[in-house]
C-alpha cells in the first residue's frame, strides 16, 4: 500500500508522525512525504522519503502578524512590543507595520505560492496514487489531495489540540489563499472537513473531534536525531535529589520576541530551591541565559525523550512535542504558554492534574518558584502524570494502527467500486 504524508514547514508539528511512517515502512508499505524544501533534510534524517515540491511557507510571518494584531487591539500581554512581522526584529512603535496593508499588497504573491504548492501536491498524488493520506494540522495539501483523489485523509495530531480547539486564527488552521478547494469543486476547508483523526493523546487529555472518527495510537516520542550523551546513564535516579528540566523553543522566541524568553526568570526561581537543573535551549537563546548558579547545567542539543525519564519535572512553553514527551515519561509539567495552541495544551494537561499552567507574561520568579515547589512536593501531580503515562501506553502501538489503516483503505476502495 502507498501512503502519502504531507507536512508543513514546522518540524515539531510532524515529528509525532515519524513513528507511524516507520511502522508503515516496516510492514512493507511505501511512504512518501510531500514537504517544503527546508523539511527535506530533517525528514531524510528521520528515515522517511521526502518529496520537496511545496513552496517555502510564510507561517512565521503570519504568526507574527497575529501577534502584532493582538498588540494593535490591546491584547498583547507583554511589556515590549512583538517583533516586526516580516523581519522578526524588535520594534518601538506599532506604526512600524500595518497588517491589512501588507496582506493587501502581498495577497497575489501568497495566492500564487499557495497555488503552486497545492497544484504540485495534487499532481504528485495523481501520479503516485496513494491509498491513504496522512497530514499535520497546518498542512493544506493533505486534506485537499485526499478529497481530490477520493481516498481517506487522516489528520495526525501533534498533541492535545485539534481542529475544533481554540481560536483558529492565522498559523493554526491552514489558509487556502488560492482557493484550491473551490478550484477542485470542493467545499472550503473547515474544521468539519476532517473526517479521520489520528490521536496519540492519553484519554484524559484527548481533545474533542466533533464528528471525526478518532484513531487512537500510542505516542512514541521522536524529537529529532541526536546522540545519547555519555553522562546521561550516570545520572542518579530521579528522587534522590529533584531534577528539573527546562526546555524552550527558539522558534517561540522568534515569534514572540526575545523579551518574552523566560529562562532567566526560571533560573532565578529555581536557584532558591534544592534542585538539580538541566537546561536545553538552542540557537541565540543560549546567549540569553547568562552565567548559571551551581547545580545548573546548560546542555548541548539532547533528544528530549532521552532526558525526561531521568527528571522529576519539566518546565516548558506548552508546545505539543514537549508536552507529549513529558506525558510519555510520566513526569509533571509546568507550562508557561504564550499563545497559539500552547494555552489550550497547557490548560488541558493542567485540568487533568498532571501539571500546572500559567501565562508566560504573568510568570515572575516568585510564581514560577511556587508552582515548581508544588509540583515537586505534591505527590498527586506525580501520580496523575504516571497514570496518564499508563493511559498512553495502553493505546494501540503504531504497528497496530497500520493494520487499522489498511482496513480503512480497503473499505474505502470497496465503497468506491
Regions found by a protein language model. Name each.
Residues 370-417:
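C-terminal amphipathic helix plus adjacent low-complexity
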Residues 218-313:
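Donor-nucleotide binding loops and adjacent catalytic segments primarily
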Residues 33-98, 102:
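Conserved nucleotide-sugar phosphate-binding/catalytic loop shared by glycosyltransferases and other
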Residues 1-57:
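N-terminal subdomain of nucleotide-sugar transferases
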Residues 36, 175-252, 282-285:
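A nucleotide-sugar donor-handling region in carbohydrate enzymes
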Residues 21, 299-348:
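A donor-sugar binding/catalytic signature common to diverse glycosyltransferases
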Residues 93-94, 98-183:
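Conserved nucleotide-sugar donor-interacting segment of glycosyltransferase catalytic cores
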Amino acid at each position: 500500500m502507498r501512503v502519502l504524508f504531507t507536512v508543513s514547514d514546522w518540524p515539531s508539528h510532524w515529528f509525532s508522525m515519524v513513528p507511524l511512517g516507520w511502522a508503515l515502512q516496516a510492514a512493507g508499505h511505501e511512504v512518501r512525504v510531500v514537504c517544503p524544501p527546508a523539511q527535506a533534510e530533517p525528514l531524510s534524517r528521520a528515515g522517511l522519503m521526502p518529496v520537496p515540491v511545496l513552496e517555502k511557507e510564510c507561517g512565521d510571518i503570519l504568526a507574527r502578524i497575529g501577534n502584532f494584531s493582538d498588540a494593535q487591539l490591546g491584547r498583547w500581554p507583554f511589556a515590549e512590543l512583538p517583533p516586526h512581522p516580516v523581519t522578526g526584529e524588535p520594534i518601538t512603535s506599532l506604526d512600524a507595520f500595518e497588517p491589512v496593508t501588507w496582506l493587501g499588497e502581498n495577497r497575489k504573491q501568497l495566492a500564487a505560492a499557495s497555488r503552486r504548492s497545492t497544484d504540485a501536491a495534487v499532481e504528485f498524488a495523481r501520479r503516485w496514487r496513494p491509498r491513504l493520506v496522512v497530514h499535520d494540522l497546518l498542512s493544506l495539501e493533505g486534506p485537499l489531495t485526499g478529497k481530490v483523489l477520493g481516498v481517506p485523509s487522516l489528520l495526525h495530531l501533534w498533541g492535545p489540540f485539534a481542529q475544533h480547539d481554540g481560536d483558529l486564527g492565522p498559523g493554526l488552521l491552514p489558509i487556502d489563499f488560492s482557493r484550491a478547494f473551490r478550484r477542485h469543486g470542493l467545499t472550503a476547508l473547515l474544521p468539519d472537513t476532517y473526517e479521520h483523526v489520528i490521536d496519540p493523546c492519553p484519554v484524559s487529555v484527548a481533545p474533542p473531534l466533533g464528528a471525526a472518527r478518532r484513531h487512537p495510537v500510542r505516542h512514541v516520542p521522536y524529537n529529532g536525531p541526536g546522540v545519547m550523551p555519555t553522562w546521561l546513564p550516570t545520572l542518579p535516579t530521579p528522587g534522590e535529589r529533584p531534577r528539573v528540566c527546562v526546555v524552550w523553543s527558539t522558534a517561540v522566541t522568534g515569534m514572540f520576541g526575545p523579551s518574552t524568553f523566560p529562562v532567566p526568570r526560571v533560573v532565578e526561581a529555581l536557584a532558591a530551591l534544592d534542585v538539580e537543573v538541566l537546561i536545553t535551549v538552542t540557537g541565540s537563546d543560549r546567549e540569553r541565559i547568562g552565567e548559571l548558579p551551581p547545580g545548573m547545567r546548560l546542555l548541548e542539543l539532547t533528544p528530549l525523550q532521552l532526558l525526561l525519564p531521568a527528571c522529576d519535572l519539566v518546565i516548558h512553553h506548552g508546545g505539543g512535542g514537549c508536552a507529549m514527551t513529558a506525558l510519555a515519561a510520566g513526569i509533571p509539567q509546568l507550562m508557561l504558554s504564550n499563545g497559539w495552541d500552547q494555552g489550550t495544551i497547557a490548560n488541558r494537561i493542567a485540568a487533568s492534574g498532571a501539571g500546572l499552567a500559567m501565562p508566560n507574561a504573568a510568570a515572575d520568579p516568585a510564581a514560577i518558584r511556587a508552582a515548581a515547589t508544588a509540583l515537586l512536593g505534591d505527590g498527586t501531580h506525580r501520580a496523575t502524570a504516571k497514570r496518564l503515562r499508563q493511559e498512553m501506553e495502553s493505546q494501540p502501538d503504531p504497528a497496530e494502527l497500520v493494520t487499522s489503516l489498511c482496513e480503512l483503505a480497503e473499505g474505502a476502495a470497496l465503497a468506491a467500486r
